[in-house]
Amino acid sequence: MGDDAQFALQVQALKEDIQRHVAHTLGGDPYPPRKGRYFLGLCYSVRDRLVTKWLETQRSFYDTISKRVYYLSLEFLPGRFLMNYIQALGIEDVCREAVQSFGMELDELVEKEWNPGLGNGGLGRLASCYMDSMATCCIPGYGYGILYDYGIFYQSIVNGYQQESADNWLRQDSPWVFRRGNFMYKIHFYGRSEVYHDSSGA
């Protein structure tokens, strides 16, 4: 089979997957195409392909009894995932062609993704760089952090006073999050708290 025929098959398969997710994952009507639904349909379709490779990688680690690195950080700032995953899978042209067939542009859909609010500082960027480096060097590594509801906040000045507003990045849930309610671990924080009043009554 030629490259053009293979490309056409990949585009057709992706189009069908996007519409399937719009209908069966989101419970929405694929017609007429709507950017919000098709953005999520594309995310879930990319995730399907990503998970297949992820599971293959996991099996190879277990089969070779590889040592693994576990990186614990209170913050991660990976940036938007969709285009990063599309490029890592080598399917950017396939995605562009599939999305254009629905009368949309890939760049428009990519812009609909919220930045994950998993932190708000240089520590988070550094942690994400470590994870990228481990992946590039084929080092089995896992990042562990906190799934914040409000990991980032916005600041504004109103009448001369600073005001903060939360960034609810999970308001529409995230297509990249696997919620595993059957796995629960107790995390203990040791120490004690003491309550007292000083001489000023504070």
State where each predicted segment sits:
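A conserved ligand/cofactor-binding region detector
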Residues: 1-202
